[in-house]
């Protein structure tokens, strides 16, 4: 079977390394490549994919929303998130999914077993935040709290959550067991501070969905304060494993995928 990841730029993507490691571990001769498709060429997506004879593909920045009009069906989780990161091509039909939310939550559950009873604060109200919130809301008992700079961002949400400003989030930080940053603050080249951690409880798990850099500024600050931290590496691996399951109906080798990504990160 043939797969790919599509984005612009895409040369930095670790998806090919991760998926190929999984194929090798499982003894599969499947292929996975990176395809750079600029925004101005995106209208040719059907033609490009058809020529490549792909069975499915991942889609990343800046095309996660742009792909939706080209799909024959969109899964509920992708509709909720307002973005697609996985496409299955079956019987000529394109079916869109979003595995980011379930990928993050599966990883988080592995390091925080009592997740269903946790009081959780999510920073940011974009697509990634929404996907994670919808997944958490399926089983977490306390009502989720989501903080954003502007309240207008919540107009597209139809989830029963506490909506607060970032300023209020700073005041009430001590009340949360887990704080999850889903904003771009802290990504490579972005040292913007999203929130002041002065009131962070020492028992709170601080998380960020970014894994490059391995420790974002907010994670470094929390670690200096003595908090446990959790980055986005597992989210990346588990979302990839979920994509593989959608394409092949097989379980991925999580360990081989994570090892391959870690080796690549250490080599950079």
UniProtKB/Swiss-Prot annotation:
One of its GO terms (biological process) is amino acid biosynthetic process. This is Shikimate dehydrogenase (NADP(+)). It comes from Staphylococcus aureus (strain MRSA252). NADP(+) binds at residues 76, 124-128, 148-153, 209, 232. The active site is at 64 (proton acceptor). The gene is aroE. GO terms for cellular component: cytosol. Belongs to the shikimate dehydrogenase family. It comes from the Bacteria. InterPro entries: Aminoacid_DH-like_N_sf (IPR046346), NAD(P)-bd_dom_sf (IPR036291), SDH_C (IPR041121), Shikimate_DH (IPR011342), Shikimate_DH-bd_N (IPR013708), Shikimate_DH_fam (IPR022893), Shikm_DH/Glu-tRNA_Rdtase (IPR006151). Keywords: Amino-acid biosynthesis, Aromatic amino acid biosynthesis, NADP, Oxidoreductase. Disulfide bonds: none annotated. Shikimate binds at residues 13-15, 60, 85, 100, 211. The keyword Oxidoreductase applies. Involved in the biosynthesis of the chorismate, which leads to the biosynthesis of aromatic amino acids. Catalyzes the reversible NADPH linked reduction of 3-dehydroshikimate (DHSA) to yield shikimate (SA). It is an enzyme of class 1 (oxidoreductase). Its EC number is 1.1.1.25. Homodimer. It catalyses: shikimate + NADP(+) = 3-dehydroshikimate + NADPH + H(+). Pathway: Metabolic intermediate biosynthesis; chorismate biosynthesis; chorismate from D-erythrose 4-phosphate and phosphoenolpyruvate: step 4/7. It holds the Pfam family SDH_C. One of its GO terms (molecular function) is NADP binding.
């Amino acid at each position: 079977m043939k797969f790919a990841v599509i984005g612009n730029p895409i040369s930095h993507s670790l998806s090919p390394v991760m998926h190929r490691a999984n194929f090798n571990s499982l003894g599969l001769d499947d292929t996975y490549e990176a395809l750079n498709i600029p925004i101005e060429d995106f209208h040719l997506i059907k033609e490009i994919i058809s020529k490549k004879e792909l069975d499915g593909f991942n889609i990343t920045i800046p095309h996660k929303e742009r792909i939706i009009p080209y799909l024959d069906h969109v899964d509920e989780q992708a509709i909720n998130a307002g973005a697609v990161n996985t496409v299955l091509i079956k019987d000529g039909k394109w079916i869109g999914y979003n595995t980011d939310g379930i990928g993050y939550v599966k990883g988080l559950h592995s390091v925080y077993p009592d997740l269903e009873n946790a009081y959780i604060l999510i920073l940011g109200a974009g697509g990634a935040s929404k996907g994670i919130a919808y997944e958490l809301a399926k089983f977490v008992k306390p009502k989720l709290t989501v903080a954003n700079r502007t309240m207008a961002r919540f107009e597209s949400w139809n989830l029963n959550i506490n909506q607060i400003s970032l300023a209020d989030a700073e005041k009430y930080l001590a009340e949360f067991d887990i704080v999850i940053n889903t904003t771009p603050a802290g990504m490579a080249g972005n040292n913007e501070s999203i929130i002041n951690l002065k009131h962070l409880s020492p028992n709170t798990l601080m998380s960020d969905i970014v894994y490059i850099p391995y420790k974002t500024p907010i994670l470094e600050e929390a670690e200096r304060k003595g908090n446990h931290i959790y980055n986005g590496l597992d989210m990346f691996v588990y979302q990839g494993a979920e994509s593989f399951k959608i394409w092949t109906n097989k379980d991925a080798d999580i360990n081989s995928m994570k090892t391959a990504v870690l080796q690549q990160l250490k080599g950079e």
